[in-house]
Amino acid sequence: MKKLSFQQIILILQNYWQDYGCAILQPYDAHVGAGTFHPATVLRCLGTKPWFVAYVQPSRRPCDSRYGMHPNRMQHYYQFQVILKPSPDNIQDLYLKSLECLNLDLKTHDIRFVEDDWESPTLGASGLGWEVWCDGMEVSQFTYMQQVGGIECYPVACEITYGLERLALYIQGIDEVKELDWNGQIGEKALKYGEVDFEAERQFSKYNLEFADSEMLLRHFKDSGEQCERLVNVNLPMPAYDECLKASHYFNQLNALGVISVTERASYILRVRYLAKICCIKWLELSSE
């Protein structure tokens, strides 16, 4: 059986969850640290309206910059996110069937659900959940989203996050992300993951760790926070949330540079959490009118 390419894995997951009834959304056009930060998760997990969506989200974590030299850790990577609200009772079975659709043999791989309650300090979000391990490496995360922006979620939504690169390593049976088959072609049309993303990985690692201007980032963090508050005050929670995302990314960049002390780090996290909270409160207030 021919092994699935990286882009085929994405297409199969999209088709699988579309057949279940999910709307297939597009990635959010902002720098986010995970698929959870997409407003389709943060804002739409709030309120009582049912919400069934799935999407790919490119994600950035400056602290994971490794100049493209690490086999499976990068500052830029892809997640596949599924939100099911209200959460179905058979969610684990649905997930395992999605792995089978990806030709992952559940009999030869050790798939384990490891209890791991999830929390995002900057989003004020938390929930009960599990990490999903394949042969000892985390490839997915399940979370019953109980709180976002410090607000209780009712009904509780289930979030599934697939780590696409790590999952692809097992499906293709290789050890390094840069060697992943991206498009399933041969000859001059063939592309590996490294040919698509790893020059950017090298350059952004240098930027994140060596050349980012910390004074400029500090100014941007302050400005984004103030703009977020102004927009919330005029009933514009969605553009306000964009500013919250910017502040979160600036904080992550400052953290990667190592210019924030342990004490300062806590205050930055509290600031971003406050911004997320006021966006969520205003979103809920307007959507319930």
UniProtKB/Swiss-Prot annotation:
<dbReference type="InterPro" id="IPR045864">
    <property type="entry name" value="aa-tRNA-synth_II/BPL/LPL"/>
</dbReference>
<keyword id="KW-0030">Aminoacyl-tRNA synthetase</keyword>
<comment type="subunit">
    <text>Tetramer of two alpha and two beta subunits.</text>
</comment>
<dbReference type="GO" id="GO:0005829">
    <property type="term" value="C:cytosol"/>
</dbReference>
<keyword id="KW-0547">Nucleotide-binding</keyword>
<protein>
    <recommendedName>
        <fullName>Glycine--tRNA ligase alpha subunit</fullName>
        <ecNumber>6.1.1.14</ecNumber>
    </recommendedName>
</protein>
<dbReference type="GO" id="GO:0004820">
    <property type="term" value="F:glycine-tRNA ligase activity"/>
</dbReference>
<keyword id="KW-0067">ATP-binding</keyword>
<keyword id="KW-0963">Cytoplasm</keyword>
<dbReference type="GO" id="GO:0005524">
    <property type="term" value="F:ATP binding"/>
</dbReference>
<dbReference type="Pfam" id="PF02091">
    <property type="entry name" value="tRNA-synt_2e"/>
</dbReference>
<dbReference type="GO" id="GO:0006426">
    <property type="term" value="P:glycyl-tRNA aminoacylation"/>
</dbReference>
<comment type="similarity">
    <text>Belongs to the class-II aminoacyl-tRNA synthetase family.</text>
</comment>
<keyword id="KW-0648">Protein biosynthesis</keyword>
<dbReference type="InterPro" id="IPR002310">
    <property type="entry name" value="Gly-tRNA_ligase_asu"/>
</dbReference>
<dbReference type="InterPro" id="IPR006194">
    <property type="entry name" value="Gly-tRNA-synth_heterodimer"/>
</dbReference>
<keyword id="KW-0436">Ligase</keyword>
